[in-house]
Amino acid sequence: LVGSEMCIRDRHDIDIILTVNKSKVKKIDASGVSIISSTPDIANARIEFEDGCIANLTSSRISLKKMRKTRIFQEDAYISINFLEKEFQVVKIRDKYECEAENSLIVKNNLGEEKVIFFENPKVQSINSIEAELNDFYESIKCESDSKVSLNDGIKALEVAEEIMRLLWV
């Protein structure tokens, strides 16, 4: 998101978001701040989908701590993905009667209904995602098969990335 050199890397993050949520993109907002350069050094993008899901992407080249984090909000869940640390957290909200799990917390909502919040930290395979995508593309050519990321999926992710970049330079 920050600077044109980061657009390619962030396109992969956008592709993941578009894969997680198949709903159409309804609205994109983005803002950035230039602090040490003529282009945004810190940027935030918000992608709103027609089904109500919202994805927030944050990127900074001057943060004290390197960060590439995506947060996805939907009606009954919150998903946080830290691409640099390879951490993935899922928080789901269910009715209390559905079940209780070890990593859960019972809370009351504003209507007095008891809900169960489940916390999950799925294991993330430590791979170089760009290298894996290039290998998949190579194998699809070699074996004359479809790649995991279709041309249309790649174009959609690139269109979203380009819209974010356009909004950052308005």
Model-inferred region functions:
Residues R11, T58-K66:
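Glycine-rich phosphate/pyrophosphate-binding beta-alpha loops
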Residues I35-T39, S63-K65, S80:
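Short glycine/serine/proline-enriched coil/turn segments at secondary-structure junctions
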